């Protein structure tokens, strides 16, 4: 059984990211994979290492600040989780959390401008294009890892 954690489901859900979890449920059901999804947020007792997959969506700046403060108590667990090759999917500004907490090796820099628009990506994982939308005011710098996607249209 796959144990999934939708972390900060209530306040990091700016663009209806709960639909990403529903899409994941649909795909797992279609493949007849057994899973359990827990929904946790601020003030919940969270045992990061109990999960096989963690998802964090996009939030407003106010929500981001609350989550950043809350995640500090899980920093070492998140580092171990990643070192153990477990999976975390973040969308939008949730990626910036891992820079601000210095969990991953990149720098997220806030800019005076916003990047808004649709993007088209390719990846070696699937044959089809991946289409997404960005509305952000941060730029990723000093990133030394191999990106998951290659941007074919838009800014990324």
Residue ranges and their predicted role:
Residues 108-156:
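Amide-donor transfer/coupling interface in amidating biosynthetic enzymes
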Residues 1-76, 80:
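N-terminal beta1-alpha1 cap of cysteine-dependent amidohydrolase-like domains
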Residues 32-34, 83, 127, 143:
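Short, well-ordered coil/turn elements that cap or connect secondary structure elements
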Residues 60-127:
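Cysteine-nucleophile active-site neighborhood
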Residues 29-33, 106, 140:
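Generic secondary-structure signature for well-ordered alpha-helical cores
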Residues 46-50, 99, 143-145:
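Short loop/helix-cap segments at secondary-structure boundaries that form the rim of catalytic
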Residues 2, 35, 86, 128-130:
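A structural micro-motif
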Residues 7-9, 40-42, 58-59, 91-94, ...:
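Fold-independent oxyanion-binding glycine-rich loops
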């Amino acid at each position: 059984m796959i144990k999934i954690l939708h972390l900060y489901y209530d306040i990091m859900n700016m663009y209806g990211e709960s639909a990403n979890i529903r899409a994941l449920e649909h795909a797992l059901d279609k493949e007849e994979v057994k899973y359990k999804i827990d929904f946790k947020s601020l003030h919940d007792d969270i045992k990061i290492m109990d999960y096989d997959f963690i998802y964090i969506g996009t939030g407003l700046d106010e929500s981001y600040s609350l989550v950043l403060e809350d995640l500090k108590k899980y920093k070492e667990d998140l580092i171990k989780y990643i070192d153990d090759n477990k999976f975390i999917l973040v969308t939008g500004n949730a990626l910036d959390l891992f820079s601000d907490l210095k969990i991953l090796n990149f720098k997220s820099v806030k800019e005076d401008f916003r990047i808004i628009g649709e993007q088209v990506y390719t990846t070696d994982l699937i044959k089809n294009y991946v289409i997404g939308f960005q509305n952000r005011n941060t730029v990723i710098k000093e990133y030394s890892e191999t990106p998951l996607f290659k941007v074919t249209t838009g800014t990324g």
